[in-house]
Amino acid sequence: MEISRASDRPFTHGEQDRFTGEVSLGSTIADPQGTNVGIVHFVAGARTRWHRHPGGQFLIGISGRGRVRSRGESGHLLLPGDVIRVGPDEWHFHGGAPDAPMAHYAVNGGGAPDWAEPVTDEEYSEGF
């Protein structure tokens, strides 16, 4: 058994080549098969770039109000307790709502994500 205590987790600032706006990341736990769990905090309007995970991703809302959208699809609201599954290699973004911050757990399957271009303001607003 492995335990990750909240008091032992340092948070780091999200890198500009992966995020737009102020984002804080907290790593929690990873297993030998490559699955990892992290906590991500977004200020209002902050978001990831377009990206995909080879092993897929689950997003579990903790607080606030967020946005999640896959390329070419309508967007979805992420609220505390909501769970969104993003399929393997599905291009998507997630972040805080324009007027509210958001925090979520991210459960990522094996393999490093592929990061692409920033989400434009138009893409961030479209489909919600």
Could you describe each region identified by the protein language model?
Residues 48-50, 68-69, 91-98:
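Short beta-strand His + acidic residue motifs that chelate non-heme Fe in jelly-roll/DSBH
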Residues 72-89:
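Short acidic-glycine-tyrosine-enriched beta hairpin
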Residues 32, 46, 68, 99-105, ...:
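Ligand-binding pocket scaffold of soluble enzyme catalytic domains
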Residues 41-43, 52-68, 107-109:
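Short, conserved beta-strand element in jelly-roll/cupin
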Residues 85, 99-118:
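A short hydrophobic beta-strand segment most commonly corresponding to one strand
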Residues 1-35, 114-128:
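A short, N-terminal "cap"/entry segment at the start of jelly-roll beta-barrel domains
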